[in-house]
Amino acid sequence: MSSDFKTASQEKVFEIMAPVGTVAFAKAELKQWMKPVDVVVPKAFRESGHTAKVYREPYGVTLVIGPFNGPLTLLFDPAVQVIAAGNPCILKLSEGLPATSKLLLDLVPKYFDPRAVTAVSGSREEVTELLKLPFDFIFFTGSVKVGKIVMEAAAKNLTPVLLELGGQNPAFVDPTANIPDAAKKIVWGATAWGGQWCTSPGYAYVHESVAEKFVEECKKAVVELYGTDPKKKFDDYSRIVSPKAVERLASLIDQKKVVAGGASDPQARYIDPTIIYPVTWDDPIMEDEIFGPLLPILTYKDFDAAIREVKKHPKPLSGFLFSRDQKAIDHFLASLSFGGGAINQVNIHLFIETMPFGGVGNSGIGHYYGKAGFDALTHAKSVLISPPDVAIEHLFPPYTNEKVQALSQWFEY
């Protein structure tokens, strides 16, 4: 991973220990997840001895397409869910990670029966051909643009999909927030993993009364986290996946608005943790998901108006609010649609197995993690069980008024 781009010590923990934790949780809970579930039937059915159960059955051969930004976590977490649900899977490795992909191509056949798990590599052409195959399920993690291509290809075979995409994720800071705490967490969230995580705060949206203080605390946080020369913090600060990606990020920076950082070195795949202020919705950096360690800071006067502004844009994968005001928290949760998120925290909801993870709208379709993932990757087969010697006579013609009246009781629970 280090030779591809992952370098921070904490990322090694998240990349390795997170999938291991997923395995342990699935092993502990799987028997319970697999059990048929009894469901209530209408009163008339109960009185005649009928019962009903929902059984879970695997969809079948599943294609898991992994992204570059989570070489292990975002490949093996879905794979664990797929396998736990009883589906054989094909792992499509990221072409952006040559060293990691080469290693996995060696290790997967060593430790897995190829009838259960197979790893393949390839670029766009190979993926295009792969998507023509009639898979039983496709699990894709990546960009909205490619997600639409995957969904279009899946539709030709009526293949169900789970799409984990992304978006420009807001981090609100209201006047009641603990400003130093909010600044440090948001700066970390925007720069951890080089900002190359789908759940990273895409921008801070700060009440104007605390904006200047927040900016100063963000500048302090950059130094506290990465020192005065982050480029030397090779163990604590990730590089970017490619020189081209660095150039794209650098083009988004308005140097006149940089209050911290701003430097880049494409050949070293490096860009500073960068704070940009003041930013407006018209700035180019706000047009799309940033996917890098840049933190634009916008200000608002009215919380309702700020939420309405966010709602004009595609639904984000994550949403964050820093506040001590419970009414503001309740309003945020009730008014803004997003995949998942946190209050007074960022990013780490991603690693909690008991919380279904997934997007909404442009940020994704479907959820995984824990029981939610097991359910998403299995078909719910509903079965009504009748005693062998019981007939519901009013079901059969000729239909008298008495039979029609009896049939109407089918809808009473």
Task: Label the model's feature ranges.
Residues 1, 101-104, 108, 130, ...:
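Hydrophobic packing residues within well-ordered alpha-helices of enzyme cores
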Residues 132, 165-166, 197-199, 233-234, ...:
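Short glycine-enriched loop/turn motifs at secondary-structure junctions
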Residues 270-413:
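Conserved C-terminal structural/oligomerization subdomain of aldehyde/semialdehyde dehydrogenase
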Residues 23, 86, 117, 138, ...:
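Residue-level signal for inorganic ion chemistry
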Residues 65, 123, 141, 189, ...:
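Conserved residues at the C-terminal ends of beta-strands
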Residues 42-181, 300:
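Rossmann-like NAD(P) dinucleotide-binding subdomain of oxidoreductase/dehydrogenase enzymes
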Residues 112, 146-281, 343, 403-405, ...:
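ALDH superfamily catalytic-core signature
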Residues 1-51:
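N-terminal Rossmann-like NAD(P)+-binding subdomain of aldehyde/semialdehyde dehydrogenases
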